Amino acid sequence: MLPSAVAAHAGAYWDVVASSALLNLPAAPGFGNLGKSFLIENLLRVGGAPTPRLQPPAPHDPATALATAGAQLRPLPASPVPLKLCPAAEQVSPAGAPYGTRWAFQVLSPSADSARLPGRAPGDRDCTFQPSAPAPSKPFLLSTPPFYSACCGGSCRRPASSTAFPREESMLPLLTQDSNSKARRGILRRAVFSEDQRKALEKMFQKQKYISKTDRKKLAINLGLKESQVKIWFQNRRMKWRNSKEKEVLSNRCIQEVGLQEDPLSRSALGFPSPCPSIWDVPQQHSSPRWRENSPEPSERLIQESSGAPPPEANSLQGALYLCSEEEAGSKGVLTGAV
């Protein structure tokens, strides 16, 4: 058999072994079932000019040709050489799980395969492909090699880590009664004072509306209270005292305004009797048309005021008072005669 024919048969054998191994292997990230890559970079490479394969130069000397053919000839192994899919570069995620970005096939010798897999014989054909086993200590979701980084040229997002969606055990517990009680410790409860304490506090408040720090400390020690309780009591008491003072001032103003706007008849109802009704009938006389006829004109009023003569209104008032005094004297005489 010629050396070229032997080399051709050997190359065909290696192609069959590699294709059979690839058919049994799961598809690598970015590769289809037929072993073709659908990544953008690989598609661009395929669409461009194919890279020429390096072929050894044709030997002109028959001796050199036999030497090269003998060097290319290798003994065929009894079992196919196993292939291993391993990541060429790994990236460590925040959670500690490796992300494989680049994948490459490594040809392992039967001795290395048997050394790594002591439980199986090197001639076992089922062991043609043995992927690297994930670490048992890491979670399952994080130990499996994610294909998101290699897919679509690395544009796909990586799966969310365990910290983004925590498990039920890591979630914070709901608010309980203990947490509520701890949160409410800072809120001061309303103090309940006894009668003696109230009397002592009220007595001190009547002396001074604003208590000093030393007096407050002494008063708290004597009454068995805290300084904060005494301070808050004085603040509330001063607020009540201010409100009561404001109410008193407003009530006094209202009484004064009502007193100024009272009618003469309401004065008699309040205890101011009017024995002479003619005095209060004077405004009615002013409104009568007869009084308007008898009343002088404004020019005549000015003349009377300049001359010093009393106005007719004063004369009418004096006459009414004189009549009232005569009536009172007559009523008194009648009462004395009856007695």
Swiss-Prot record:
Q: Which CDD domains match?
A: homeodomain
The record's annotation in InterPro entries points to: H2.0_Homeobox_NeuralPatt, HD, HD_metazoa, Homeobox_CS, Homeodomain-like_sf, HTH_motif
Domain of life according to the entry? Eukaryota
Record's keyword terms, sorted? DNA-binding, Homeobox, Nucleus
Residue ranges forming the DNA-binding region read 186-245
What is the protein name for this chain?
A: Homeobox protein DBX2
Q: Which organism is it from?
A: Homo sapiens
| Comp. bias regions, Basic and acidic residues | 290-303
One GO cellular component term, please give it.
chromatin
Signal sequence, renumbered to the chain: none
